[in-house]
Swiss-Prot record:
Mn(2+) binds at K201, H221, D258. This is Phosphoenolpyruvate carboxykinase (ATP). It comes from Flavobacterium johnsoniae (strain ATCC 17061 / DSM 2064 / JCM 8514 / BCRC 14874 / CCUG 350202 / NBRC 14942 / NCIMB 11054 / UW101). Belongs to the phosphoenolpyruvate carboxykinase (ATP) family. Its EC number is 4.1.1.49. It is found in: Cytoplasm. The gene is pckA. Keywords: ATP-binding, Cytoplasm, Decarboxylase, Gluconeogenesis, Lyase, Manganese, Metal-binding, Nucleotide-binding.
């Protein structure tokens, strides 16, 4: 059904101040695909997916993300390098310029919503300069029924104009690109960047303020799935730690792969209606769900084709390492109807520790869970340039600091209370290195990580012996089905045990240094979850 024909007459952007625009409203995925190809802005890949290039920006630009400092946000947002304040007057002037820029142009408008739980539904209208940006929002946000559109009232608006360039000297931005949230006007304003993830993370950031402040609901940067008995599992983790991979389990139904809410009514729900997956080095063997989802309707970003073909070379990172695909969650077979589950029974914190110190699986106390949640640790492998092989620690509070407007301890307190009330087991999973740090040891085998998670989910680790790690104090199981017991204690996998002890203390000191800025806000239980540093 061509909704454009049905509803174009009733959609006006005058309320937004965009005048005389040619509005292409609620186009189907096929129509947006065709327009993008016809305009020369994209190419159809051999699988039927649409491939586009996002331009100069192939990732988010955290230094150019702002929140308008107003009566709603002034006393609640944790202002600083993550949440950078923007003056209401400056926003008004910049928004007026964007409105004038989009007036008298063809624009693509989509009505959608976020939050799959009907009690928390938030209607979002998206106004984009390009058809492919609109396709991204069709894929990623939830899609209302045609019957809902006649009476659709947007609560938030996303305005995305990639070819509008700000003037930093006049507009108060850092450079020509920007992503700004205004909680009074309820607008996410994006310009100067074609990276589609700015739209997704803009609304995620808005929900990360709205839900805890007004709805007593914990927003989470996590994936989630449900077992045959209705038991929900949640996987927190930064990019590259295995959220998408480990939540894709043939024995369990996927709720979602990235953004969820945990309500006071004991439900866990997906914010989104799609998946936004990395495709670097993608193979059907390692990631069958993602690989098979790259078909008609999917949107590939910044990939390269094999010479002379329209077949994607997933190993080619000549444009960026952050090659991506978005697709509706319905492209995956094994999904949870309605994208809602009940209270989780197990929570997994995923870290790719390339120092090789943390155990592959350990059980956390409530205090340790809060400490590690606030820390949000993983480690990046340094680039090979100039012979640098030493891993770099990466701490991102709540496993998603760039998207969290409130102080991290606010989210941690909510999580701690919910974990205690629901009697949740919390596990720290190291998907990183074993037998030494990066360069000496090896990456933990995926089959072992999967076996450990399966054992935890099935209750097979409830009655085994545990020994506390001497530095981090976390409880290491001494046995696990289908996993060699020698890898469960990381110290035993190192040839040089003294070096392991030294490096473990060094990592603990990195944790302590990072946590210093949170100490004054943390209670005694959380502080007791810290590692020993001497």
């Amino acid at each position: 059904m061509d909704n454009n024909t049905l509803f174009a007459q009733s959609i006006s952007l005058k309320e937004l101040g965009i005048e005389n625009a040619t509005v292409r409203y609620q186009l189907s995925a096929d129509e947006l695909h065709a327009i993008t190809v016809q305009s020369g802005q994209g190419v159809e890949a051999s699988t039927g997916a649409l491939a586009i290039n996002t331009g100069e920006f192939t990732g988010r630009s955290p230094q150019d993300r702002f929140i308008v400092k107003d009566s709603i946000t002034e006393d609640k947002v944790w202002w600083g390098n993550v949440n950078i304040p923007f003056a209401p007057e400056a926003f008004e002037k910049l928004y007026n310029k964007v409105k004038a820029f989009l007036s008298n142009k063809e624009v693509f408008v989509r009505d959608s919503y976020v939050c799959s739980d009907p009690n928390y539904r938030l209607n979002v209208r998206v106004v984009t300069e390009t058809a492919w940006s609109n396709l991204f929002c069709y894929n990623m946000f939830l899609r209302p029924e045609d019957s809902e559109l006649a009476n659709f009232t947007p609560e938030w608006t996303v305005v995305c104009a990639p070819s509008f360039m700000a003037d930093p000297a006049v507009d108060g931005t850092r450079q020509s690109n920007f992503a700004i949230l205004d909680f009074t006007k309820k607008i996410a304003l994006i310009g100067g960047t074609g990276y589609t993830g700015e739209m997704k993370k803009g609304i995620f950031s808005a929900l990360n303020f709205i839900l805890p402040v007004f709805e007593n609901t914990l927003p989470m940067h996590c994936s989630a799935n449900v077992g045959k008995d209705g038991d929900t599992a949640i996987f927190f983790g930064l990019s590259g730690t295995g959220k998408t991979t480990l939540s894709a389990d043939p024995e369990r139904k996927l709720i979602g792969d990235d953004e969820h809410g945990w309500t006071a009514e004991n439900t866990v729900f997906n914010f989104e209606g799609g998946c936004y997956a990395k495709v670097i080095n993608l193979t059907e063997e390692n990631e069958p769900d993602i690989f098979r989802a790259i078909k008609k309707g999917a949107l590939l970003e910044n990939v390269v084709f094999k010479a002379g073909t329209n077949e994607v070379d997933f190993d080619d990172v000549s444009i960026t390492q952050n090659t991506r695909v978005s697709y509706p969650i319905t492209h995956i077979d094994n999904i949870q109807p309605g994208s809602i589950g009940h209270n989780p029974k197990n929570i997994f914190f995923l870290t790719a520790d390339s120092f090789g110190i943390l155990p592959p699986i350990s059980k956390l106390t409530p205090g340790q869970a809060a400490y590690h949640f606030i820390s949000g640790y993983t480690a990046k492998v340094a680039g090979t340039e100039a012979g640098v092989t030493e891993p770099q620690p990466n701490f991102s509070a709540c496993f998603g600091a760039p998207f969290m407007p409130l102080h991290p301890t606010k989210y941690a307190e909510m999580l701690s209370k919910k974990m205690k009330d629901a009697d949740v087991k919390v596990w720290l999973i190291n998907t990183g290195w074993t037998g030494g740090a990066y360069g000496t040891g090896s990456r933990m085998k995926l089959k072992y990580t999967r076996a450990m998670i399966t054992a935890a989910l099935n209750g097979e680790l409830d009655n085994v012996e545990y020994v506390n790690h001497k530095v981090f104090g976390i409880a290491k199981p001494q046995s696990c089905p289908n996993v060699p017991s020698e890898i469960l204690n990381p110290r035993n996998t190192w040839e040089d045990k003294d070096l392991y002890d030294k490096k473990a203390l060094e990592l603990a000191q990195k944790f302590k240094a990072n946590f210093a800025k949170f100490e004054e806000f943390a209670n005694a239980e959380i502080l007791a979850g810290a590692p020993i540093t001497e």
